[in-house]
């Protein structure tokens, strides 16, 4: 499943295609959304927000389309009039004069009013988004030490969207390697230096992944661009200590780590 950085990049692509342009045609597959087709035609997409792995498409009339891709959903951008060759099932089409965005295969799709946004079960449940620039390491540290989370092992906590939205398995693996900890630790057992390092890594690594993953490191500046240090690198040497990276299972997900320098 895509994690927060991938979801945010997808939202950026969708925004670049249709934000601020009048919608010339709107189509929904689900019967309960059909009444909104005429209400949205002629309106503008004002912004596309991410809340962890959910997308919120905000319209100029105050409505918001909530969608969660789950395992199989995918958004695509096409030129208006193009007919994509795909076996996927179309769920949403938002069309402008020159670009159209399409949502395939997703089933978790709703239209929300401004009031419903504040009471939606998933949105109420998720924690602050790691890609929200307003979120600070100090706030993350306070969250780590809160009664709700301080006794949770990191193996499960870093996959829990109620703790921080947008984290997932590869981020869990890379964050714990960065701070030299195993997944069995709990926040209540860390010293001040470890807490500070983890609080920063929980924001720095997702944000680095969002801004640079997939780019070529032309200047060869070590650490300037995101790349996997341990994820999917079992059997290779750890670049920090030379130990051999191992693969195991934690919280029912593949976990990669260096037993030599992660304690």
From Swiss-Prot:
Zn finger spans (FPG-type): 229-263
Binding site for DNA: 70, 125, 169
Any GO BP annotation: base-excision repair
Cofactor(s) it depends on: Zn(2+)
InterPro entries: DNA_glyclase/AP_lyase_DNA-bd (IPR015886), DNA_glyclase_Znf_dom_DNA_BS (IPR015887), EcNei-like_N (IPR044091), Endonuclease-VIII (IPR023713), FPG_cat (IPR012319), MutM-like_N-ter (IPR035937), Ribosomal_uS13-like_H2TH (IPR010979), Znf_DNA_glyclase/AP_lyase (IPR000214)
Active site: 2-3, 53, 253
Catalytic reaction equation(s): 2'-deoxyribonucleotide-(2'-deoxyribose 5'-phosphate)-2'-deoxyribonucleotide-DNA = a 3'-end 2'-deoxyribonucleotide-(2,3-dehydro-2,3-deoxyribose 5'-phosphate)-DNA + a 5'-end 5'-phospho-2'-deoxyribonucleoside-DNA + H(+)
Family annotation (PANTHER family): ENDONUCLEASE 8
Biological role: Involved in base excision repair of DNA damaged by oxidation or by mutagenic agents. Acts as a DNA glycosylase that recognizes and removes damaged bases. Has a preference for oxidized pyrimidines, such as thymine glycol, 5,6-dihydrouracil and 5,6-dihydrothymine. Has AP (apurinic/apyrimidinic) lyase activity and introduces nicks in the DNA strand. Cleaves the DNA backbone by beta-delta elimination to generate a single-strand break at the site of the removed base with both 3'- and 5'-phosphates.
Protein name, as recorded: Endonuclease 8
Lineage: Bacteria, Pseudomonadati, Pseudomonadota, Gammaproteobacteria, Enterobacterales
